[in-house]
Amino acid sequence: MALTEKLNTHQKALRINLDLTSYGSFAEIGAGQEVARWFLVVGGASGTVAKSISAYDKNVSDDLYGTGARYVSKERLKAMLDSEWGQLIKQLAKSRGSDTRFFSFVDTISARNYAGTNEPHGWVGLRFQAQPGGQPNEIVFHINMRDPSNPLEQEAIGILGVNLIYAVFFQLDSGESFLENVAQDIGTRVEIDYVEVSGAAFEGWDQREILIALLHAGLAEAVCFPSSTSSVPPLEVLHKKAVVLAPGTFEHLDPTHAAIHEEMLASGVRQLREEFDGKDTAPAGFFCLSAEPLRQGDPPPGIAELLKRIDALQARGGDILLFRKRELYTMTDLVNRYTKESVRFVVGLSLLIRTWEYRYTKLAGSFLEALSRLLAQNVRLYVYPMRSTDLQQSIQDISAVGWQWTDTNGWVSAPQLRPRTPLDHLYDYVLASNFLVPMQIPPTPRAEE
């Protein structure tokens, strides 16, 4: 059977079982033993499975893998990998190490609970040798499960695990094609929003490029690039946090424009902190980019261009969320998975107008549905003022029709802006209902991107 032929999960598991050079262990917690099960049911499992274990009891798990880490965390996954790999090599390297590529597959999963009130997610890891006797290589995923039931989640995890093991042994090409192979037959059932690789088998792979490739492949809705540490899953920075989001293209990041973006985000964080009125809460602020183009029909920004913008923002101490889609309501959807605290967008008038002018053809409810999803119960838009001359140019660039405004000393704020009829009635409503919150005119004149 040609290696280029696309195999289903059953065929992949059987091919691995019949390959006498690959042999390893499985440790799965939280979603059954669905990965190991594939190898056990297709036939020839003795050619692949040295051990399969699930340590559900916390005391048993602590005895095997140590204490101190959350049970569903990268730290726990790494402890599992260290333990399982160490045992495998200690027990089998002498007897069959000269002709065996060893591997240890582990996962720790928070599956959907009975009430369906949690956010199902988990960590998946694989340590393996690319050739017998070789140094170990490692790949770690953070995943989000999107299936509506626990049995379906388990099924998807099983497919993902088989795909991963098959891909490292038979399809370890470029990062993008590797990810496509790992995601085969999964669709939108599992998101991968974090990847970490190490070892000679992944030489030349760039982790940040891989994260962006996840978005381009439709495998994640967002990835995170903090300024002070290495990449983490969005869950790690959004969980139960009050959040301020500053979306933009950030195409122009010369010192002047960069300072404007920085000031807008900082102003939003200050304003939300003032809303808390003395509560000991520190909002988290993020610059938000999109892997899609700002204007419909334009080509999407490439990986190199996105990394250039990310580097420029990180150089100024900015934490970044990079989203797969451009629409603001998709950002609300993602952030509200992880927090019920206050969420605030900081937007300029030009982006506000784009949001109202955008054609939401993919939504059954069009603009009204987009607006209702954007302005969820915990969401408000802080609207940053803009100079009248810049607003005029922006409206021409957008080709927006019927917008009018007045200004104060050359500056236009949200209450001074008027869309065309009938949008003006809806605009008045969201403004009067405090979903749109005007921000103060800056003390010194500045142009907005």
Give the ranges of each region predicted by the language model.
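Long, charged/polar, low-complexity intrinsically disordered N-terminal extensions
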Residues: 2-16, 24-25, 31, 37
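Active-site cores that bind ATP or allylic diphosphates and position pyrophosphate for catalysis
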Residues: 4, 23-26, 35-38, 43, ...
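Hard-cation-handling environments
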Residues: 19
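Short, glycine-rich nucleotide/cofactor-binding loops
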Residues: 28, 246-260, 362
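Short active-site-proximal "capping" loops at secondary-structure junctions
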Residues: 31-32, 54-58, 292-294
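Nucleic acid-processing catalytic cores of prokaryotic defense/repair systems
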Residues: 46-55, 60-65
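Conserved catalytic-core segment of nucleotide-activated headgroup transferases in glycan assembly
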Residues: 253-268, 293
